[in-house]
A protein has these predicted regions:
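Core catalytic DNA strand-manipulation module of type IA topoisomerases
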Residues: 1-173
């Protein structure tokens, strides 16, 4: 018997594994489910904005910075060249108001993030919407998508931990 372990992290990986197992004989030895919490990510720095825009929107670094520059020049976001993950008191308070309005008090958890990078350029605060009340903007499709990414990340950074369940199944084949 092979005691190899297969770690399945996504729904897609689980479906692929189940498809590969079709027709096989197996026994479910054990199933355990336990609660887990996930802390929201910090607000965007230049680097994390570029990474997330590439991952979620397919934008290159140059595209991201060009679009962010337009958003900044239009007054929609704070300065986009920063290593800081800090938010102003205004941003924290208005994020709290938005979360309460959309989801209720229990989802609010104001946080203060610390920049861990040695020698970080923190003259500016984290990249965030200039006015948190503006959930969307007028602009090109690309500008709207990048703004939405920034707005959601800023709001998420001030929310309570996500409460999830982790399920582990032991299957012998």
């Amino acid at each position: 018997m092979d005691d190899s372990v297969i770690l399945v992290k996504t729904k897609e990986e689980a479906k692929a594994f189940l498809n590969a197992c079709q027709g096989a004989t197996f026994t479910i030895e054990d199933i355990t489910t336990r609660p887990v919490k996930k802390t929201p990510p910090a607000p965007f720095t230049t680097s994390t904005l570029q990474q997330e825009a590439a991952r979620k929107l397919g934008y290159t670094v140059a595209q991201t910075m060009m679009i962010a520059q337009r958003l900044y020049e239009s007054g929609f976001i704070t300065y986009m060249r920063t290593d800081s993950v800090n938010l102003s008191e205004y941003a924290t308070a208005s994020s709290k108001d938005a979360i309460i309005h959309m989801m209720g008090e229990r989802y609010v958890h104001p946080r203060h993030f610390e920049t861990k990078t040695k020698g970080a350029q923190e003259a500016h605060e984290a990249i965030r919407p200039t006015y948190m009340e503006n959930q969307s903007i007028d602009g090109t499709a690309q500008e709207k998508k990048l703004y939405d990414l920034i707005w959601k990340r800023t709001i998420a950074s001030q929310m309570a931990d996500a409460e999830l369940e982790k399920t582990t199944a032991t299957i012998s084949i």
